[in-house]
């Protein structure tokens, strides 16, 4: 087993996932104009990737121990390929809906396989390596937003932008086809399937799953919908996503030192506090301060997703691949519901106020998420210190 090749292939698979978010965030307005879609329709299309993701993630998490990782990665490849091509040749709302669903299903399968894969091949350093793996999510969004920005200014269109995803898709498909996969940690350790499902009912796991709803909404709703919400405030609203994602990429690359200094629970508490400040600034500032706000927000959400997954992998290992998948699926499902609700809310606000105030109102409404998380993670920090000291 070549764990370096497996890790590199996993990173390329996550690049495809993140490009789908970054590029789609950058072309939402183009799609809306080209196909004459309403605000509600475009928010539903954007949300589809988020509920296709959890469906696939839960199914993948339940099957990965039985079928093995390799067949599920082939399925992820086919979903990605079909979704990209269907988007390029879309002719209206329904084809965009279906193509986004396919990409979401592919994205979920990547997470369902690659999270337990990384945890299995780096058992001695799970949280750090999951942060290194997940740096390619904001890293891919940086690439995606840069592609979207450059291609739009060159008038190359949204179809060409979607086509760029085919290169990393081909790379991860080739690498995985040539590499042998390990069994998951749960299978290796001999934990029964019944015990794995029983461990999903542990109070600590349920607490982390509920917190995942808030961390995912704070990070992913804001990132995916920021061009729509703030395009009236800044001519280059997509660059706000570029800056916040760039900060996240750098931060996750430096995760090893942060994990040793703060511990995972300290990282989560600090992330919640800083993301509260960042989201508040995004909702209240304009001009050059918007880009400063984006950097603060990016720093705040940097460690949310991988550290939540890493915490479960390290402290609740008997929940297995299903536990990691349920965490991610819960977060993505929450984002899909929240995005659809906020799409209708935003559309209603535009009738009563200008676009600028409507976008800011949506962000201010979302602010309660990191505020609640700050209190929750403060409690978790105290609890884990007492438990580890016992």
Predicted regions, residues:
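Helix-loop-helix hairpin linking two adjacent transmembrane segments in secondary transporters
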Residues: 124-125, 129-184
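Helix-breaking motifs and short loop linkers at transmembrane-helix boundaries and internal kinks
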Residues: 36, 68, 89-94, 123, ...
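Symmetry-related core transmembrane helices of the 12-TM Major Facilitator Superfamily/SLC fold
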Residues: 159-177, 360-382
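Extracytoplasmic gate region of multi-pass secondary transporters
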Residues: 24-25, 201-249, 338-343
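Conserved MFS/SLC helix-loop-helix module at the cytosolic interface between two early adjacent transmembrane helices
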Residues: 55-94
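Central cavity-lining transmembrane alpha-helices of secondary-active solute carriers
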Residues: 47-62, 242-254
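Cytoplasmic helix-loop-helix junction between adjacent transmembrane helices
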Residues: 99-135
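Extracytoplasmic
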Residues: 5-39, 115, 222-227, 338-342
């Amino acid at each position: 087993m070549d764990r370096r090749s497996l890790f590199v292939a996993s990173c390329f698979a996550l690049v495809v996932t993140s490009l789908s978010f970054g590029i789609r965030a950058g072309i939402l307005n183009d799609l809306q104009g080209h196909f004459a879609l309403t605000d509600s329709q475009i928010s539903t299309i954007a949300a589809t990737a988020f509920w296709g993701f959890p469906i696939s993630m839960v199914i993948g998490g339940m099957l990965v121990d039985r079928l093995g990782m390799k067949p599920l990665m082939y399925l992820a490849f086919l979903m990605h390929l079909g979704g990209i091509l269907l988007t390029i040749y879309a002719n209206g709302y329904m084809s965009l809906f279906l193509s986004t669903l396919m990409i979401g299903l592919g994205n979920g399968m990547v997470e369902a396989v690659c999270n337990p894969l990384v945890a299995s091949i780096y058992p001695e350093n799970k949280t750090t390596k999951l942060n290194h793996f997940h740096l390619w999510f904001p890293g891919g969004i940086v690439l995606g937003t840069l592609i979207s920005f450059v291609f739009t200014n060159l008038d190359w269109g949204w179809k060409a932008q979607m086509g760029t995803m085919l290169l990393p898709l081909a790379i991860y498909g080739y690498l995985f086809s040539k590499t042998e996969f390990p069994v998951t940690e749960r299978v290796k350790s001999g934990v029964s399937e019944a015990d794995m499902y029983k461990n999903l009912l542990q109070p600590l796991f349920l607490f982390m799953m509920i917190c995942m709803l808030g961390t995912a909404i704070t990070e992913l709703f804001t990132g995916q919908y920021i061009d729509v919400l703030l395009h009236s405030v800044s001519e280059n609203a997509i660059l706000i996503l570029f800056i916040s994602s760039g900060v996240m990429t750098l931060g996750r690359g430096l995760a090893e030192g942060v994990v040793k200094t703060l511990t995972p629970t300290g990282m989560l508490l600090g992330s919640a506090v800083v993301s509260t400040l960042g989201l508040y600034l995004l909702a209240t500032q304009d001009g050059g301060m918007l880009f400063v706000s984006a950097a603060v927000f990016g720093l705040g959400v940097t460690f949310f997703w991988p550290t939540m997954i890493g915490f479960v992998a390290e402290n609740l290992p008997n929940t297995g691949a299903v536990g990691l998948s349920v965490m991610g699926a819960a977060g993505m499902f929450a984002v899909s519901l929240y995005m659809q609700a906020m799409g209708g809310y935003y559309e209603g606000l535009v009738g009563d106020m200008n676009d600028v105030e409507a976008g800011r109102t949506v962000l201010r409404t979302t602010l309660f998420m990191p505020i609640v998380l700050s209190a929750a993670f403060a409690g978790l920090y105290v609890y884990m210190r007492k438990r580890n000291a016992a």
